[in-house]
Regions:
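Short, surface-exposed, charged amphipathic helix/loop patches that serve as local interaction elements
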Residues: 1-225
Length: 225
C-alpha cells in the first residue's frame, strides 16, 4: 500500500490498479457517464484520513484537485513515474509527431487553503458572485450534460449572483469583461496538481499545450486506443 498527502492536507492510502481497473477505464459507456474514474478511485482508495470504508459518495465528495492528484499517484504506483508522450503538432501545415517524456514527480502541486466558498465582485456590473470549488459531484454532472459550454462549466460552481440562483441566461447576458474576470478568479483560487504540458513543435516551432490526463499514454502506455 502507498500513502500520500492530498492537496487538502488529508492523508490517503492507495493500492495499485489491476486489470479490473483497466477494463473500467476502457468502458466507453462508463467514460461518457463520468463513472469510470469514480469507480477506479473507489476501488483503489484504501483509506482517506481515518475513513477505511471509502464509498462512491466519499469519492464524489472529494475536491477535483484531490481527485486528479489521486489519479496521478495511482498512475505512478501502477505504471511508473515517467509518461512518454507522442503529440501531433496543431499546425495543419505541419502535423509533425513530437515525442516528450514527463516525470510525474515534477508536476507542481498547490495545496488548498481553509476557505471553501468565495465571494467575487464583478468589475463591470458590481454584482457579487459566490462560488465554490469543483468536486466529483459537479464533475459527474458536467460529464452527463449534452451540451458542454463555458457557461455550464462556470455555472456549476456558482452558488448565487447577488443572492439569486444562477441561470444560463444570467451567464450569457454577463459582459465578457465580467465573465473573463470571474474565470480568472476561479483559476486563481483553484488548487491541486497542475497536469498542463507545454512545449514547441520540433519541426515548425508551433506551441503545443495539453492536459496529461487527456493523453492515452497517461494510463495506457504503448497501447493505441
Amino acid at each position: 500500500m502507498y500513502t500520500f498527502i492530498l492537496p487538502t492536507s488529508s492523508e490517503i492510502e492507495l493500492r495499485e490498479m489491476t486489470g479490473a481497473e483497466e477494463e473500467l477505464l476502457t468502458n466507453q459507456k462508463l467514460i461518457r457517464s463520468g463513472d469510470a474514474v469514480n469507480q477506479v478511485l473507489k476501488n483503489c482508495i484504501i483509506r482517506i484520513g481515518e475513513n477505511e470504508d471509502v464509498s462512491l459518495t466519499n469519492v464524489l465528495d472529494m475536491l477535483s484537485g484531490d481527485r486528479l492528484f489521486t489519479l496521478v499517484k495511482l498512475r505512478q504506483i501502477s505504471l511508473g513515474d515517467e509518461v512518454d508522450l507522442e503529440l501531433t503538432c496543431p499546425n495543419t501545415a505541419c502535423r509533425a509527431k513530437n515525442r516528450a517524456t514527463v516525470n510525474l514527480d515534477d508536476l507542481p502541486v498547490t495545496p488548498y487553503g481553509e476557505e471553501r466558498e468565495f465571494v467575487f465582485t464583478l468589475p463591470a456590473s458590481g454584482s457579487k458572485v459566490r462560488f465554490v470549488y469543483l468536486d466529483g459531484h459537479k464533475e459527474k454532472r458536467l460529464a452527463q450534460m449534452q451540451e458542454h459550454s463555458i457557461s455550464s462549466a462556470m455555472m456549476i460552481r456558482i452558488l448565487d449572483i447577488d443572492g439569486n440562483t444562477p441561470s444560463k441566461k444570467a451567464l450569457n447576458e454577463m459582459s465578457m469583461r465580467d465573465r473573463s474576470a470571474l474565470r480568472q478568479e476561479m483559476l486563481r483560487v483553484d488548487a491541486g496538481i497542475d497536469t498542463t504540458i507545454e512545449f514547441d513543435c520540433d519541426s515548425c516551432g508551433s506551441h503545443i499545450r495539453t492536459k496529461l490526463e487527456a493523453e492515452p499514454s497517461f494510463l495506457f502506455p504503448g497501447v493505441r486506443l
